[in-house]
């Protein structure tokens, strides 16, 4: 089925939809005809994306949510079901990047990274699933992992380990829903490099001083090699609609990383840092 057939109506909830991939997915779903609940920790960002959807004839509402607080996700789920009675698509997208050596990153930044990137996904699914299951209708849950879910990267340990966790959670959730015979599709979304604001300087609050230079390098790399955001999000929505478990913006890159990961696991040797990655971090 094509995306306009699957997501031509119904309600979608997208977390972290005020910027980056979340905003691109929200806009695409609005174009297709869904009512989009645009959630973000920033009211101004959520309202901006909501207005962008409405200007193009779509239907959307803005909602302020901090996904690191499970009570706010519980409240969001209750309010959405009270207002609309259904959710066809839940996109657990909210996430932050954290750069720096493990022992130099403050405890507060570690807690924020893991709470947003892991617990935000888990509690998003936990909060919405009871009512989705009760409806008995076909639905979709898309969790944002990353191609980093199949790699190891020093100075990005928090982000990388969180994406490994999201991938593992998505696999387990898929099996659990299959176990109970629920008509719910789970997707693990594996974006490659897209042109987003994830490496902007304001996102680095609480990181060690040395991380600023790394952020600048990643911004340059993204500007040069990143895929257009709207094109990447169009591919994501299209593959979710097709029922793919793994959803990839750049399949060849994903396949290369998976092959390298399999070789690493088979070897049972310690991980090694490639020369390109070393230059990116150390130069």
Indicate where each model-derived feature is located.
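Active-site helix of classical SDR
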Residues: 125, 162
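Substrate-binding pocket helix/loop in short-chain dehydrogenase/reductase
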Residues: 101-102, 106-111
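Conserved glycine-rich Rossmann-like NAD(P)H-binding loop of the short-chain dehydrogenase/reductase
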Residues: 34-48
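Residue(s) in the substrate-gating loop at a strand-loop-helix junction
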Residues: 146
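Conserved glycine-rich cofactor-binding loop
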Residues: 11, 18-20
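SDR active-site lid
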Residues: 178-250
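The beta1-alpha1 cofactor-binding region of Rossmann-like NAD(H)/NADP(H)-dependent oxidoreductases
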Residues: 43-44, 64-75, 107
């Amino acid at each position: 089925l094509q995306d306009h057939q699957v997501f031509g109506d119904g309600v979608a909830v997208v977390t972290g939809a005020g910027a980056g991939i979340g905003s691109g997915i929200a806009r695409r779903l609005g174009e297709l005809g869904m009512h989009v609940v645009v959630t973000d920790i920033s009211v101004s960002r959520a309202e901006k994306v909501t207005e962008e959807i409405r200007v193009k004839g779509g239907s959307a509402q803005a909602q302020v949510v901090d996904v690191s607080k499970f009570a706010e996700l519980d409240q969001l789920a209750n309010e959405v079901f009270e207002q609309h009675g259904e959710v066809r698509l839940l996109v657990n997208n909210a996430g932050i990047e954290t750069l720096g050596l493990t022992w130099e990153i403050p405890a507060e930044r570690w807690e924020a990274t893991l709470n947003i990137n892991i617990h935000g996904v888990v509690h998003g699914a936990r909060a919405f699933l009871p009512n989705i299951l009760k409806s008995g209708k076909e639905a979709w849950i898309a969790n944002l992992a990353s191609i980093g879910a199949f790699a190891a990267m020093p100075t990005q340990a928090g982000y990388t380990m969180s994406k490994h966790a999201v991938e593992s959670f998505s696999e387990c959730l898929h099996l659990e829903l299959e176990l109970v015979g629920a008509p719910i599709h789970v997707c693990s979304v594996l974006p490659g490099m897209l042109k987003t604001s994830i490496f902007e300087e304001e996102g680095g609050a609480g990181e060690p001083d040395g991380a600023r230079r790394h952020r600048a390098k990643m911004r340059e790399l993204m500007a040069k090699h990143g895929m257009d955001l709207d094109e990447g999000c169009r591919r994501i929505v299209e593959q979710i609609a097709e029922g793919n478990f793994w959803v990839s913006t750049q399949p060849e890159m994903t396949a290369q990383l998976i092959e390298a990961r399999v070789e690493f696991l088979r070897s049972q040797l310690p991980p090694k840092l490639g020369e390109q990655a070393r230059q990116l971090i150390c130069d």
